[in-house]
Amino acid sequence: MAQFDLTRINCQYLDRHLTFPLLEFLCGKEIYNQQELLEYILETVNKTNMIDYTMDTRKRLNLSQEMPEELVQRKAEVLATLKQLQNEVAPIMKATDILKNGESMKDSKTFVNALQKDYNFKMEHLYSAYKLAKYLYECGNYQESTSYLYFCLIVMAPNDKNYLNVLWGKLAAEILTLNWNTALEDLTRLRDYIDSANFSTIQALQQRTWLIHWSVLVFFNHPKGRDLIIEMFLYKPLYLNAIQTMCPHIMRYLATAVVINRTRRNALKDLIKVIQQESYTYRDPITEFLECLYVNFDFEGARLKLHECQTVILNDFFIVACLNEFVEDARLMIFETFCRIHQCITISMLADKLNMKPNEAECWIVNLIRNARLNAKIDSKLGHVVMGTQPLSPYQQLVEKIDSLSMRSEHLAGLIERKSKQKNQESIDSWKYY
């Protein structure tokens, strides 16, 4: 189903190393020609210092089993450069126990003073640590790279020319080592920096667009990610604007998060509005499923789209792990919406709408009732499901109000900030005439 594959688009906004898991995932699918895909991986990995990965890819392409002379020479150069960089950092290598102990690095000023006093630390050592961290990352040694990147974050001033690069590098390395808790902390730190930095409008938009794509990797792997992706993508106007302007395809991941997050059903109304606004620029089976169900009340269309959704999710690296949960919650959405219209439903009709056999549908409904997620009764003799009322809980009402107020507050804050910048710019421009 290459028609709905977003890998090519997503890779444009990811670091080269972050694309490898996506490309390797596609190798296990039958969407693209395997030979061409492996050739692209080889072309990409050749731009890094991961010589072993390069050789492995060559073998998969049935190229030479022996390492070419060019790669032998390049590997020697990589090892030599790595040793040189490690020698440059040698004066602070004695402090490796401090590097690995994050607790002792909380206070930046105290830490720098201790380094200068005990290890004769100089600021040129900081640049050496930055170069080594970057080189280790290029070699695929992400774990060791994170130690030096963290060191740079503690010692480096936020106005340093390399500070933003360190933030991005640290986030990428934590993602690639699957350290999701730390990755979320780095994501938050980077977002705060971007939102407070004095970027031009275009630069800020570009930075947020990249961050949106990287954050999807974190959100769908962190326990709190399903709430956080909704808050960031739907209720932070600056990021929602970036999605609508630069990357409407991200609606797929926002929609998926809302579907599988039963505690955030209040977000559906706002999500549907955005989906309708962007339907002329981006559509896929997941967004169309929600349109069929909540805009057109087309249950047959929703049933068919749900079947397509399964294929789309199965072939999407970001959300493949959510497949079973998505199908279960999507069926529940169909069921709940159908029940709002029909108070009494036959099990056979319901089974047809849910793509299930009648006995499977009955067991499914029984489990919903048993788990206190559904106020209904089953008449087994007549084969009917009789619905009770489904009031919105006070908690859900409160969350809905808070989200609405939060979104309005952020929108007003953004408006005030833009007007302030415009006023300052006009003031600066007026000096040009004197």
UniProtKB/Swiss-Prot annotation:
Keywords for this protein: Cytoplasm, Initiation factor, Protein biosynthesis
Subcellular location as annotated: Cytoplasm
Domain of life: Eukaryota
GO molecular function: translation initiation factor activity
Residues of the signal peptide: none
Protein name stated in the entry: Eukaryotic translation initiation factor 3 subunit E-2
PCI domain sequence ranges: 219-392
Main subcellular localisation: cytoplasm
Database matches in HAMAP family: eIF3e (MF_03004)
Subunit structure, interactors included: Component of the eukaryotic translation initiation factor 3 (eIF-3) complex. The eIF-3 complex interacts with pix. Interacts with mxt.
Matching SMART domains: eIF3_N, PINT
Functional summary from the UniProt entry: Component of the eukaryotic translation initiation factor 3 (eIF-3) complex, which is involved in protein synthesis of a specialized repertoire of mRNAs and, together with other initiation factors, stimulates binding of mRNA and methionyl-tRNAi to the 40S ribosome. The eIF-3 complex specifically targets and initiates translation of a subset of mRNAs involved in cell proliferation.
Cellular component, GO annotation: eukaryotic 43S preinitiation complex; eukaryotic 48S preinitiation complex; eukaryotic translation initiation factor 3 complex, eIF3e
Pfam families: eIF3_N (PF09440), PCI (PF01399)
Any one GO BP annotation for this protein: formation of cytoplasmic translation initiation complex
Family: Belongs to the eIF-3 subunit E family.
